[in-house]
């Protein structure tokens, strides 16, 4: 399959069960410990109401967050990512000041059998286009120092390391790197 064999779109409010299923699959991936802040054990215990609320919030207009999925011809959700809008003057999850309005990509996942065909770039292209429509000045994401596969995929999607490094939330002896995609104003 190629990236053109998928429909990349925003999730709909009623699709919370599919959101939950894909999240649980992602959290079982071999690199989930360094790719996601949440664990499978925590996620599986969360109430369905949390997934309903996430899906409903993501589907709202206007929204400060939007989740995108890549849907295969057979209806399978092959991958997903979420873009959060961070407002200038707010603080991020580390307590650092957000200096400008920006998108923050989280929850990036593509099922193993759908990797290597350009799908991740198609997801990023759609997410970044939405972020630009929201008036952000750049888009960023964080990636674990040891997640080389993800770093390569992010580079292929146009992201570059910014030089910002933060301690990994689960283990202060490890780091995460900020990657950014910026454009001229």
Identify the role of each PLM range.
Residues 21-113, 124-126, 130, 167, ...:
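Acetyl-CoA-dependent GNAT
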Residues 9, 143-144:
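Active-site-adjacent beta-strand anchor residues
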Residues 1-7, 185:
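Short, low-complexity, intrinsically disordered N-terminal peptides in bacterial proteins
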Residues 137-138, 144-151, 155-185:
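C-terminal "cap" of GNAT-fold acetyltransferases
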Residues 107, 111-125, 133-134, 145-152, ...:
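Conserved glycine-rich acetyl-CoA-binding loop
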Residues 7-21, 33:
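A short beta-loop-alpha structural element at the N-terminal edge
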Residues 7, 104-106, 139:
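Conserved Rossmann-like nucleotide-binding pocket used by diverse enzymes
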